[in-house]
Amino acid sequence: MSMGIVEGAFLGLVQGLTEFLPISSSGHLAVVGTLLGSDPGAAFTAICQLGTEAAVIGYFRKDIARIIGHWARSLVGRLPRNDPDARMGWLVTLGTIPIGVLGLLFQDSIETVLRGFVVIGTTLWLFALVLGAADRFGRKERTLDQLSWKHGLLFGLAQALALIPGVSRSGGTITMGLLLGYTREAAARYSFLLAIPAVVLSGFYQLYDELSRGTTIAWVPTAVATVVAFVVGYAVIAWLMRFISTHSYTPFVVYRIAAAVVVYALVLAGALPAFQGTGGS
């Protein structure tokens, strides 16, 4: 079944709701898309994520403008590289390298084998346990002013795990932040900033790659999905930043485990294929 505007809008809603929560937007898009009759695929996911990253840019626009400005001035020697905002720009650059390199090296596996629903179900519950442990036992004392180069790279490696559907980009980086002793707010804030270059570059790369292959893209539904993802994503960011200031990540841990059970049940019922290329997708 080809994707229509209604399906595109619904998938955009799913993307906007799940991109910034540590529950895996790619996993949800794969499940919902397949149940609707067509897995949206890696290209649709990447393009749709441009909408949610536009929401990040809009929400943190003042911080981002300051970071980019100071980082650019540090490039030409007008500011020292240890200036806090210039340094944040360099840390985001460093943290983007792992996902860029690994994404290119393992692109074929990401788009085929790793999109199997047994993989998604397993990563949902497995990383739920890791997130729960990090939130429970992490010291939650450090702020972003204490972010080191080593920690910046570790955040980047955690983000690279999100290449596997079901892990969650924000879930991976937030979990790493908690394990390293950062506050919930600091971990989430850096997670959102770190995602911007990776997701934007990935979206445009996927777009170029699909066009160069002659792949037909359902442009209108994809555009609708991207706009919906932007609006919903902006609201979710605002809500999440307020929520984690007074609450733990336990609700998301419980949700991930429940979602994993549902995915396994749907696989057993034959509604979802266990592995890419099998079953009814």
Curated annotation (Swiss-Prot):
GO terms for molecular function: undecaprenyl-diphosphatase activity. The chain crosses the membrane at residues 90-110, 113-133, 147-167, 191-211, 217-237, 257-277. HAMAP family: Undec_diphosphatase (MF_01006). Bacitracin is thought to be involved in the inhibition of peptidoglycan synthesis by sequestering undecaprenyl diphosphate, thereby reducing the pool of lipid carrier available. Its main location: membrane. The lineage of its organism: Bacteria, Bacillati, Actinomycetota, Actinomycetes, Kineosporiales. GO terms for cellular component: plasma membrane. It is found in: Cell membrane. Its EC number is 3.6.1.27. Pfam families: BacA. Belongs to the UppP family. It catalyses: di-trans,octa-cis-undecaprenyl diphosphate + H2O = di-trans,octa-cis-undecaprenyl phosphate + phosphate + H(+). Catalyzes the dephosphorylation of undecaprenyl diphosphate (UPP). Confers resistance to bacitracin. One of its GO terms (biological process) is response to antibiotic. This is Undecaprenyl-diphosphatase. It is a multi-pass membrane protein. NCBIfam families: PRK00281.2-1, undec_PP_bacA. Keywords: Antibiotic resistance, Cell membrane, Cell shape, Cell wall biogenesis/degradation, Hydrolase, Membrane, Peptidoglycan synthesis, Transmembrane, Transmembrane helix.
